[in-house]
């Protein structure tokens, strides 16, 4: 079994997570859905930190050869960047899958 790398959320990912949880818990009045999403996100992050290359490599004109990967979490996508030198995984964004992904990736900030 591979060693587990450290995981961190960028400021953008933290803001995304806050927005998603608020939307699910408050706007949809479904705190159970918010808790379930948080659990699924935690599991996806743990998997990414244990197996950094487990997510699909993102092929996009705005991210040429960057090594950014993604994992699907229900209706959402978690974009992350493994750093083998530092043995860290940086979660860059967590976004609703039906958003304009090109626009998200264009300004992902790596």
Description of each model-found segment:
Residues 73-77, 81-110:
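Enriched for short, Lys/Arg-rich terminal
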Residues 6, 68, 106-109:
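Short capping/connector residues at structural and topological boundaries
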Residues 5, 23, 37, 51, ...:
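Aromatic side chains
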Residues 50-85:
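Basic/aromatic recognition patch in beta-strand/loop cores that engages polyanionic ligands
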Residues 16, 40, 44-47, 70:
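Residue-level recognition of specific faces of alpha-helices
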Residues 1-40:
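Arg/Lys-rich, positively charged N-terminal/basic patches that mediate binding to nucleic acids
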Residues 20, 24, 45-48, 52:
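Hydrophobic recognition helices of helix-based DNA-binding modules
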Residues 2, 52, 58, 90, ...:
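Residue-level signal for pocket-adjacent positions within structured domains
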């Amino acid at each position: 079994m591979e060693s587990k790398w450290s995981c961190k959320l960028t400021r953008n990912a933290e803001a995304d997570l806050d927005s998603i949880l608020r939307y699910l818990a408050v706007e949809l009045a479904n705190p159970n859905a918010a808790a379930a999403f948080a659990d699924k996100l935690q599991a996806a992050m743990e998997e990414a930190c244990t197996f950094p290359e487990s997510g699909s490599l993102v092929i996009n004109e705005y991210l040429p050869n960057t090594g950014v990967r993604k994992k699907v979490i229900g209706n959402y996508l978690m974009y992350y960047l493994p750093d083998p030198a530092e043995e860290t995984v940086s979660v860059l964004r967590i976004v609703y899958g039906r958003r304009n992904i090109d626009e998200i990736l264009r300004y992902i900030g790596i």
